[in-house]
């Protein structure tokens, strides 16, 4: 759909003629989207036909090592490069994938990206949703965000929205596809 209105903080004062900052926070200030990006990890798995919401998985911390292609894979804590935790380091035990989304579990997002699909497939879908490139909105200056996808920790973090940055406008565009059955 079209953007009909746009607003941001009340820092603009029409009575002040000398304006030092014309930054549009929605298009020019990238940020780590956090859990709002998990929707697209789940969407990639669903669209690939590999998602079973009732399938059980490990909802505890996701400790990881690497495979032969330097992608993150689940490992034991004492034989890992590091661990990703859920909020408050809570250990959920065995949960299904739907519950992983409901509770916004980082560990389940990592499992979906690294075991149900692959980090490369997830990245491909994020690009299709319009992340890491201009939205190309008429007349608005834009930042593209930053993609960190070099190390296993970067790839794992991308599944739950950390380590890379996007803009609010990119996120709105991507969610418009989710709410419109895939049409942006």
Pin down the residues of each PLM region.
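Beta-lactam-recognizing serine transpeptidase/beta-lactamase-like catalytic domain environment
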Residues: 2-29, 40-184
